[in-house]
Amino acid sequence: MDDVIVRFAPSPTGYLHIGGARTAIFNWLYARKHGGRFLLRIEDTDAERSSDEAIAGILDGLSWLGLDWDNVPYFQSQFTAEHQDAAKRLLENGRAYKCFCTKAQLDEKREQARKNKTTYQYDGTCRRLTATQVTRKEQAGEPYTIRFKVPQAAGAVRIDDLVYGNIEKRYADIEDFIIVRANGQPLYVLCNAVDDIRDGITHVIRGQDGLANTPKQVLIYQGLGAPLPKFAHMSLTLDPQKAKISKRKHGEQVAVHYYRDHGFLPWAMVNFLVLLGWARADSQEFFTKSELIDAFDLGGINRTNSVFNISADEGKHFTDPKLMNINAHYLRHMPMAELLPFIKARLAKTDLWKPAFETEQRSWFVSTMELIRGRFNTLNDFETYGRAYINDDFIMDETAVRKNLKEAAAGQWLPELAKRLSELKDFESGTIEAELRLFLKDKDIKPGKLMNAVRTAITGQGVGPDFMKVLTVLGRQRVVNRLISAAGISV
């Protein structure tokens, strides 16, 4: 295969949302698989809606996902003169013309089409102007747009899409479309094609919603005498009601930064978004970076739209269960050395991080994180459910307290258990277990009742990791102190 050059060209009108992120990921994977280049172009020609904040958000989102680009990101607005020059060339070679129709005239044509119950399409009034008529109108100072002159022959634009196969659009169904506004500002349909030609883009990989522009851009390529890239249009991402995912409708819940802030791992997000519209023949679900690059191909992109099962629920089910499962998988199985920086960053946002966790307490901290991560779904769980393991200021779950402390009348025997544990020669699993067995026998308490009460007393939770390991990682002093404190709660 010739050198592959692809691009991601977002408009900086808001944050990076999951639809745009998925497009970027597919382009990045394709470039990396084929040893090609992944370019980043900021399409900022809509000056009124573009913002520096949005640009920064897009760059931060891509960086967080681990998508590196191979150029210095540039702005489409830097090449306005080049876009205008392309329009001039199309005028000169007869592939475009100046249109002097006013807004009122066009509105009248649209209204007439509505009354006739026909689809409005520009009728080519100014296409038939002679050179002399055009000159007179220009000399009179009449404003004009520039329209592309679509062939009037009985034919069609044909696209061999790498996902959807052969696509045809009849010339008769494409109006002479505007490529430059009356104020001289080139439109997206022209700018995008001209930029792709200049950058040598070999594959245009984008959402299905871009398909409407593709026949027009093919005509622009042909009008400028440029070779066509290959096109691959991805299926759309829908919400549970089968509506297209959008920033306007769904808000921050479809923003990449929303998932970063809610404790999702970057690679888990990449893994999930790839599977949201692409699959390998063997249905493999979890990939390392190298595995995914090797496995990815455009033929695996689904033609049917995918559903992102977001929910308005603010609880644990706020997002797609598959995303949660994928994140939990990586959280529980990725090498601890890779996970620790993410844990540190999360804890550092609160009062929970201590420099000692990287020095004299490192061994204890690593073993504790290894113990508790097995039940966690997001990094935020280290801050909430994991708090009791690294800080004495933690929340007691009301349900667990009511069930395991108050109903168990644990206040009667927790202080005595604390005393007996404080007197152990060694506070390690073997001696602790032996003492607990003696205590159970002496007090005639069922093992489950004791374990649940102790777990709630020392962690504030009703469930958790291996009981004996929890005791040992917390250490004698913390366990004893918390048992004594919990005795007051259970009264």
Locate the predicted segments by residue:
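N-terminal Rossmann-like or analogous alpha/beta NTP/dinucleotide-binding catalytic cores
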Residues: 1-115, 213-226
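Glycine- and acidic
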Residues: 6-12, 40-44, 198-204, 253-255, ...
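Residue-level signal for inorganic ion chemistry
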Residues: 27, 58, 90, 94, ...
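Generic alpha-helical structural context detector
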Residues: 60, 88, 222, 271-274, ...
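Residue patterns forming the tRNA-binding/recognition surfaces of aminoacyl-tRNA synthetases
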Residues: 84, 93-95, 127, 151, ...
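Catalytic adenosine-cofactor/nucleotide-binding cores of aminoacyl-tRNA synthetases and other
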Residues: 225-396, 459-491
